[in-house]
Every structure is written in C-alpha cells, then in structure tokens.
C-alpha cells in the first residue's frame, strides 16, 4: 500500500455485518507521532477515527479489519467496506499493525489496504521520485488504497514495485484485483477511482475528490 510507493521506481459464508468507529487511543497516537504523523500535517490526530469492519481474506475467511480515516468520512467508509464484505471481495491485509507497525508486525509482502499516512502525493511512474510537494489525499484521511500489489500505480510502462507487474494487464482477472462492483461501491459514497484517470493509472486508489 502506502509503504510500497516509497520504493525506487522500477521498469465465505457471510453473516451479520458489523462495523464501528472510535477516536485514536493514546498509545496509537503516540506511535503515529513517531512515524506517520508530524506537526504541520494538514489534519490533527483528533480529526482521525479508527473504523473497524469485517473483511474476507484471500483464503475466503472472515477477518476483523481496521483502517484510520478522517472523522468526516468514517460513516461512508464503514458503509463501503460492508458492501465489499457482502461481495466477498478479498483483501490481503487490513489491520492497524499491518499498516503502522511495530516493524515486526508489518507483512513482508506489504500488500496492505489502508488510508491515513501524512505524506506528499507520489508522482506518476512516468516522472519518478517519491514526493510531489503537494499533500496526498491520504494525508487528510480522505483516500484508501486497496490491495496495492494487485492494483498497481502504473504509467509509461513502469510500476513502483516489480511484484505489481503481473497485475498491469487488467484483462487478466486475478484474485484481489479491483472489480467493477468494487468501483460501484465506492462511487455509491461519492468517491472516485484512480483506474479512471487518463494516462497514468492508480488502480489501488480511491478518494473523496477522485485525485
């Protein structure tokens, strides 16, 4: 997910769906202050919420997931992930420890679905580099990346991680790739998809303003 974009540029049976949101507890706030948030970020930690939702993993098993988003989208994010769960759409990893650590808890494959990370937007692979000088929607908690390995940021024949390369051809449907039903679920809450961009495509990326 967001971790991957810091890399060098390279050529179930379903029951009741429950979800909840809550402010960040003090230990998590402290952890973020030493990593993914700093003074000068466009939102405060008090603006953020943990949204807890069930998801279906790549083995078809129900898991309990968490994602940090801005409080003004917590309800709609909860709604969209309930829809993904009902669709049985597979998500590789979606727990706070997967995204924010500690380091020993971060999955080796880094194929983590997540939202908040106070950082710049990442330039197109056509341009290269890791920072654009402009805040990403992730810095506001207004964007979500879904299964980043299976849904690459792609442009000019380039990706940011070689593990993404097998998923560039979207005509070859593979597990974890964003489907039309997933796009419709996000559109139902007013979010746009990076797969609709002209030129460079960001297949993992959904956001409130479509950017």
Where is each model-derived feature located?
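Bacterial N-terminal signal peptides
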Residues: 4-12
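Conserved short secondary-structure elements within globular domains
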Residues: 92, 99-133, 185-192
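Structured segments of extracytoplasmic/periplasmic soluble domains
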Residues: 56, 79-90, 119, 149-152, ...
């Amino acid at each position: 997910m967001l971790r991957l974009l810091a890399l060098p540029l390279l050529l179930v049976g379903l029951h009741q769906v429950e979800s909840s949101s809550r402010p960040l507890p003090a230990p998590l706030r402290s952890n973020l202050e030493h990593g993914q948030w700093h003074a000068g970020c466009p939102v405060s930690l008090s603006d953020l919420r943990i949204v807890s939702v069930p998801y279906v993993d790549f083995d078809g098993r129900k898991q309990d997931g968490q994602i940090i988003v801005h409080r003004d989208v917590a309800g709609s994010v909860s709604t969209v992930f309930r829809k993904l769960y009902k669709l049985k759409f597979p998500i590789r990893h979606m727990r706070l420890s997967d995204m924010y650590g500690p380091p020993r808890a971060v999955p080796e494959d880094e194929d983590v679905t997540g939202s908040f990370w106070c950082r710049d937007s990442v330039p197109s692979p056509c341009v290269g580099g890791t920072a654009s000088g402009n805040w990403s929607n992730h810095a506001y908690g207004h964007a979500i990346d879904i299964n980043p390995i299976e849904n690459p940021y792609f442009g000019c024949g380039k990706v940011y991680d070689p593990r993404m390369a097998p998923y560039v051809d979207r005509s070859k449907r593979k597990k974890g790739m964003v489907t039309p039903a997933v796009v419709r679920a996000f559109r139902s809450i007013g979010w746009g998809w990076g797969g609709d961009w002209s030129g460079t495509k960001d297949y993992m990326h959904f956001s409130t303003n479509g950017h």
